[in-house]
């Protein structure tokens, strides 16, 4: 299983590194948020040759990163900010299902999506309010 980590401080300069910077999006109630977390996935052995033939070594920059950013942004744009803490497991399950639909024909299987930090970004520069955070912070 591979872990694609979305976190502050990730170096996006390596296009094929398994990770990304926090995803910035807007909730249904028009609040700007920053999202960190992990996507756990594996290469489907049965479809691995097709993955390498059609996409090659660049599957992170061509598939995992753009699809993950798009789906995370889309799913959280349909949720009100006040509902995020109570809907965390449902959001994670929705993301897992949607990513699996997109990845399955590419030979990638999503095992899980874990949201570790969701922060509401206030209008004041540099101000944020944590919606939920991983226990290690």
Kindly label every feature range from the protein language model:
Residues 1-9:
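Short extracytoplasmic
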Residues 8-137:
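Elongated, amphipathic alpha-helices that form coiled-coils and helical stalk/scaffold elements used
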